[in-house]
């Protein structure tokens, strides 16, 4: 099962947040694809 990306926190640099949200979207896609 895919591991949920770590939240970098409010004061993380923009690149880190962008990377996190991309990983999170990918993670959600993986989970929903497996479920349905």
Swiss-Prot record:
Belongs to the NPY family. Keywords: Amidation, Neuropeptide, Secreted. It comes from Oncorhynchus mykiss (Rainbow trout). One of its GO terms (biological process) is feeding behavior. This is Neuropeptide Y. Gene3D superfamilies: 6.10.250.900. GO terms for molecular function: neuropeptide hormone activity; neuropeptide Y receptor binding. Pfam families: Hormone_3 (PF00159). PANTHER family: NEUROPEPTIDE Y/PANCREATIC HORMONE/PEPTIDE YY, PTHR10533:SF12. The modification Tyrosine amide is found at residue 36. The keyword Metal-binding does not apply. One of its GO terms (cellular component) is extracellular space. Coiled coil: none annotated. It is found in: Secreted.
């Amino acid at each position: 099962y895919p591991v949920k990306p770590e939240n970098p926190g409010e004061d993380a640099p923009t690149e880190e947040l962008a990377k996190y949200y991309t990983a999170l979207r990918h993670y959600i896609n993986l989970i929903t694809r497996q479920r349905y």
